[in-house]
Amino acid sequence: SMIEGARSILAGDADVVVCGGTENMSAAPYAVPTGRYGARMGHTQMIDTMIKDGLWDAYNNYHMGTTAENIADIWGITRKEMDEFAASSQQKTEAAQKAGKFEAEIVPVPVKVKKDIVEFKVDEFPRAGVTAEGISKLKGAFPVGPESPNPRVVHTFEPTGIQETDDKGQQRVTAANASGINDGAAALVLASGEAVEK
């Protein structure tokens, strides 16, 4: 939406644009492919659209976690590096929250929890006290090898200058170093220089 907003301003179609986006992974529905015309006699299947529509590589027909494993193989990224980066991200977020870095940009949302109304104003995904050593104990989330339901693919692209690692072909993506499943929303006002001056 930010790109489209900027294009609108550059093209002269608008002077001020409110750009926004939402993510509601927890409410992603299950799809029943046979539901429209009937399953007839026998069992049917429910498909998790969070995975099939949001986390699925439509070109290669496998989970995006497998894509991450493939990229790690190609670029020689180790499990240790992935865990260190993930822990660093969590630590920076924790420090920013404690320092109130983004409080002025956060709009609290009232949420009904049972009979009470709770003001939701702190991102619930970050975890305090995360260390690379701690998350290194987690098992990989995506099986590898010929028995894997998400087999790795053979790449014709091999970047030069990348060092082979002992982790190649091993499980590296875990619940701790992968993207989280969460909800959120953000909005931003873009304006031309003339509009700002007005």
Residue ranges and their predicted role:
Residues D53, E69, D73, G169-A175:
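Flexible glycine/proline-enriched surface loops and loop-helix/loop-strand junctions
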Residues K52-G54, T78, N177:
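A short, structure-level motif marking secondary-structure boundaries and short turns
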Residues S1-E23, T66, A72-K101, A187-E197:
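Active-site-proximal alpha-helical scaffold in enzymes
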Residues E81-E197:
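N-terminal extracellular/periplasmic Venus flytrap/periplasmic-binding protein-like
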Residues A6, V16-I71:
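Flexible glycine-/small-residue-enriched beta->alpha junction loops
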Residues S1, N60-M64, G180-A186:
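Catalytic-loop motifs flanking and including active-site residues across diverse enzymes
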